[in-house]
Amino acid sequence: MTSNLGQPQAFFKKTLVPVLADLRLAIVLLLAIALFSISGTVIEQGQSLEFYQANYPEEPALFGFLTWKVLVTIGLDHVYATWWFLSLLILFGTSLTACTFMRQLPALKAARSWQFYKKPRQFGKLALSTTLDPDQKPSLLKALEKNRYKVFEEDQSIYARKGITGRIGPIIVHASMILILLGSIWGSLTGFMAQEMIPSGTTAKVSNIVKSGPWSGAQIPRDWAVQVNRFWIDYTPEGQIDQFYSDLSIVDEDKNELDRQTIHVNQPLKHKGVTLYQADWSIAGVRVQLNNSPVLQLPMAPLEAAGGRIWGTWVPTKPDLSAGVTLLTTDLQGTVVVYDESGKLVSTVRTGMSTDVNDISLKLVELVGSTGLQIKSDPGIPWIYAGFGLLMIGVIMSYVSHSQIWLLTADDQLYVGGRTNRALLTFERELVEMIESSASDSALSPSTNPQPQEVA
């Protein structure tokens, strides 16, 4: 009775692994990953359903088929966290691993072995080969060593090689790409992204999570909060925004300061693996004084306007709230326009100035800004950075030529031949120069040691 226990193992080794190690499969997977990565860059990620319904309507559909329903159904609104994108990464990593063990490591093993040519006809398969006087052998060996070749001798055969680094480079490239893939997958599973709009002078916990992985709970901060000490904007002389800043403190549950930094665009605050980016801004409120009353802080709400961003609030001017004025502003430069109940422009005031309206004095004390923070944690980033560092090293190493030269003394002739995996013209020039430099040297008796040995 024949056992079938070995059939799955045979299928794995003889069918599945060769398919995974096929370069064509790796190229197809890489192109698919690149295509979907581009789509994730072009299509806004992590937005609300209303956003996609407004920007990707069913009529007319983008490119004739791309509607909000297609985006949401396939997962193009969160490409990098979808099961199929992660599956592509895993499959690509598996293909690279199989290729490394099936092709690159055996190639390295073969390159490190001593390959002696014993018969003159073996030189016929080399792209570069010639015959010399046997007297040139000693000087040719010296030339090989001078050009940093490792020389091995067995009887009348010589094998020399250099540039084994060029065979290690592709393995490092594969390993680095696998490391990058692992970092991307780990970041998708354990990372999170939150967005917070925090008024100046207030404290808030990280709560508005817009994207998170299934294992991200440990990364979301629970024992500390963000305190905005101050938020301000620098403007150009033309009135355009130059840069906006947030003076942030990380505080624990007892309000003890754990960390503090002033951040701006491209200069984030990092704390315990969580990065806080300056992403947006808004106007939270306005502080006003009516006659000699205490200073009142009123919230300001964003309003729809064709000309840009605008914020507004309503200030009552009578105790029974039967009358009031509307305050509007477009920035934090301290200028506010005042309108009465009929929509008529009453005045334009700046911070510290007063205006008379409805028989009272209204003083603009301060505009209160809000900082928009993007708070992220991606535990896979160190892996990705390490992978890219290794990738650059591996690419540089791959450009090193692996060159091999064989010598054989037979039939009163010295057979010389060589090959390289890149830079053929440079290798040919080097070989010719070594042959020419040895043309006038005296002969050296060949070694008769039966065991391979490295010539010092």
From Swiss-Prot:
Spell out the subcellular localization from the entry: Cellular thylakoid membrane
Q: Provide the membrane topology annotation.
A: Multi-pass membrane protein
Transmembrane residue ranges:
23-43, 82-102, 168-188
Q: Which cysteines are joined by disulfide bonds?
A: none
Taken from the UniProt entry, a GO cellular component term is:
plasma membrane-derived thylakoid membrane
Name the InterPro entries for this protein. Answer: Cyt_c_bgen_Ccs1/CcsB/ResB, ResB-like_domain
Pfam families given in the database record? ResB (PF05140)
* One Gene Ontology term from the biological process aspect of the record: cytochrome complex assembly
The organism's superkingdom is given as Bacteria
Q: Which UniProt keywords apply?
A: Cytochrome c-type biogenesis, Membrane, Thylakoid, Transmembrane, Transmembrane helix
Q: Does the keyword Cell inner membrane apply?
A: no
Subunit details: May interact with CcsA.
Known function: Required during biogenesis of c-type cytochromes (cytochrome c6 and cytochrome f) at the step of heme attachment.
Q: Which family does it belong to?
A: Belongs to the Ccs1/CcsB family.
This protein's name: Cytochrome c biogenesis protein CcsB
Print the organism lineage.
Bacteria, Bacillati, Cyanobacteriota, Cyanophyceae, Acaryochloridales
Gene designation: ccsB
